[in-house]
Design a protein with these regions (language model features):
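Beta-lactam-recognizing serine transpeptidase/beta-lactamase-like catalytic domain environment
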Residues: 71, 218-228, 263-319, 324-563, ...
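Periplasmic/cell-envelope proteins involved in peptidoglycan metabolism and beta-lactam response
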Residues: 1-293, 314, 339, 387-397, ...
């Protein structure tokens, strides 16, 4: 009996100890939950009933100098899944099945995104850049699937397609590597849209606005109970270019319709260096990167041509360079403009025969320039010497970059005896003759030739070209002026030299090879060129500057058509169309242009 009582007391004591331990564990757990981890569990509870739908701010717009929005924003919709909704596999599979056709995604991809949202407990973006057509069907599906929501945003839009595409560039989704490099205070998220090329890339920080977001209170089924906070976005700053809309479009259309559809056209203001037009063909349509995600866009699979021939293509300037040869001879005093030189169609230099493109007979300075007589310039160059020609080359900065703020600009190649001497190679009379007509090792970009035309038009001011005039903040209204005139160098030729060059180039337009740009009411000065190409058809050049009759030149341009053969026939019509567009002499009907679209605040479409 005593043994039994002792055994019973021991068991009772053990049970009491176990109960005490269990009670202590429970008490500690309660302390842990209610005190030590109170904030963590509170945040978890808040997360279960609060969801955030991010709203991407509209990018700043890009305008031409005459106020046309060439990069703007269009309405679009984003589609979210709120993780507070139902989470059972059958429901999620059916949801993916019904959504996939409207999102132009596979069921597996939709399900993967939904499951990711369930796992993270955050609102998950299923699709963006949706068109109005898809949103109508998705709005109906919201009635059957609590927890899926549409939100109205904007997407990038290029109303004029490939207009100045090599300058404006395009946007695309950033990858993880790019995201890690970005300033996170700017509000970037993985897959945010950023500038990938051109102005879109260069001015990314200015064009990108500050994103907003809608903080929602949702119930256990994912239905919206209330909007806790609506943080409005702020649009990015607007960029204003120096481009003239009609002029740029005339350049692009001309290149597109040319013999080969390949080339470049550049126009500058010879009074400031502002870029009035800069076109490279073939161009590309940046809309292929920002099309509606639910619409078929077969162009997206095509590789775009980002090569900017205007600043990256280098070619011999051909007969447009005869202006340099003429200037050198005039400066050196070896040229009597009244002296006539006979052109029998060829020029003998020792055992070599250098041909002219025609038989011109006796020609003086003005006829030699206007008829682009090679023999005339062979004689003048042999008397003047290559060193004098090279000196004038350097005055106009040949062989150097123009200084424009564009990536990948080529400097071209300066051609002359000094350069040869540096390379410890000989210079021959044949080199001088080739140099005199812009052939041989001399290479230039179309932009360089436009800069040269502007320098002659301004009587020696070699300007740094610029294409952005100002940036205007949509948040503060402040204007940041970027367009500043910068004279890189002064081509200090004698005033009489410039007078004679003007007269010869005017004679070329009125009576010579540049007659295609003779336009009533304008004083046009021009020069044609046909660059020899040992690998195929020759290239066509046209260089000109012009002003209203009796006024100083207000535009200088260079047109280049790759494989276009004759400069007059291939590049001349484009130059004429550009001048007519710039001076609006053809008096076109007022173009219907897009409004300076002010983006409406985003809206959330709920099923509550």
């Amino acid at each position: 009996m005593a043994v039994t009582r002792i055994f019973f007391n021991a068991r009772l004591k053990t049970m009491m100890i176990l109960a005490a331990v269990a009670g202590a564990v429970i008490a500690l757990r309660l302390v842990d939950i209610q005190v030590l981890r109170h904030n963590a569990y509170l945040k978890m509870a808040e997360r279960n009933r609060t969801q955030i739908l991010y709203q991407t701010a509209p990018r700043g717009r890009v305008f031409t100098a005459d106020g046309v929005a060439v990069a703007s924003n269009a309405p679009a919709f984003s589609f979210y899944y709120l993780s507070a909704g139902r989470k059972d596999p059958e429901y999620l599979s059916q949801l993916a099945h019904d959504l996939a056709p409207h999102l132009k995604m596979s069921e597996a991809d939709v399900l993967s995104k939904v499951e990711k949202g369930v796992k993270t407990g955050k609102a998950t973006l299923l699709a963006e850049n949706l068109s109005t057509k898809s949103t109508m069907a998705l709005q109906e599906l919201q009635l059957y699937y609590p927890g899926v929501y549409l939100i109205e945003e904007t997407k990038r839009s290029y109303p004029y397609g490939g207009f100045a595409s090599h300058l404006i560039g395009y946007i695309g989704s950033m990858d993880e590597r790019e995201w890690q490099k970005r300033d996170q205070s700017m509000g970037y998220r993985l897959n945010s849209k950023i500038g990938k090329n051109g102005i879109e890339k260069k001015f990314e920080k200015k064009l990108k606005g500050h994103d907003g977001g809608v903080f929602l209170e949702v119930d256990y089924r994912g239905r919206v109970k209330s909007i806790i906070q609506d943080k409005k976005w702020s649009a990015g700053s607007d960029v204003y270019l120096t481009l003239n809309f009609d002029l740029q479009r005339a350049a692009e259309e001309g290149l597109k319709k040319s013999k080969t559809g390949r080339g470049a056209a550049v126009a500058l203001d010879p009074r400031t260096g502002a870029v009035l037009a800069l076109a490279s063909a073939p161009a590309y349509d940046p809309n292929i990167f920002v099309g509606y995600s639910d619409e078929d866009n077969p162009k997206q699979s095509k590789k775009i041509n980002e090569y900017n021939l205007a600043v990256q293509g280098i070619y011999p300037p051909a007969s447009t360079f005869k202006i340099i040869t003429a200037a050198a001879a005039l400066e050196d005093g070896h040229l009597d403009v009244k002296r006539k030189i006979n052109c029998p169609g060829h020029y003998n230099s020792g055992p070599r025969v250098f041909k002219c493109w025609s038989t011109h007979g006796p020609v003086d300075f003005f006829d030699g320039v206007s008829n682009s007589c090679d023999v005339y310039f062979y004689v003048v160059a042999s008397e003047t010497g290559a060193a004098a020609i090279e000196r004038v080359e350097r005055k106009f900065m040949f062989g150097r970059q123009t200084g424009i703020d564009l990536p990948g600009e080529k400097a071209g190649n300066l051609y002359g005896p000094t350069r040869r001497a540096r390379n410890k190679t000989y210079w021959f009379i044949g080199d001088t003759l080739n140099l005199s007509i812009g052939q041989g090792e001399l290479l230039v970009t179309p932009l360089k030739m436009a800069q040269f035309a502007a320098a002659v038009a301004s009587r020696g001011n070699v300007y740094r070209p610029y294409y952005v005039e100002k940036i205007v903040s949509n948040q503060t209204g402040k204007t940041e002026v970027l367009g500043k005139t910068d004279i890189l160098q002064k081509a200090d030729l004698k005033p009489q030299t410039y007078d004679l060059l003007f007269k010869a180039l005017k004679h070329t337009v009125d009576n010579g090879t540049a007659r295609r740009v003779k336009i009533k009411g304008l004083d046009v000065y021009g020069k044609t060129g046909t660059a020899q190409n040992p690998h195929g058809k020759d290239h066509g050049w046209f260089m000109a500057f012009a002003g209203k009759e009796g006024e100083e030149p207000s535009i200088a341009l260079a047109v280049f058509v790759e494989f276009g053969e004759g400069g007059s026939s291939a590049a001349g019509p484009i130059a004429r169309a550009m001048l007519e567009a710039y001076f609006r002499l053809n008096k076109p009907e007022a173009k219907k242009r897009n409004p300076q679209n002010k983006t409406a605040p985003p809206k959330i479409m709920t099923n509550c």
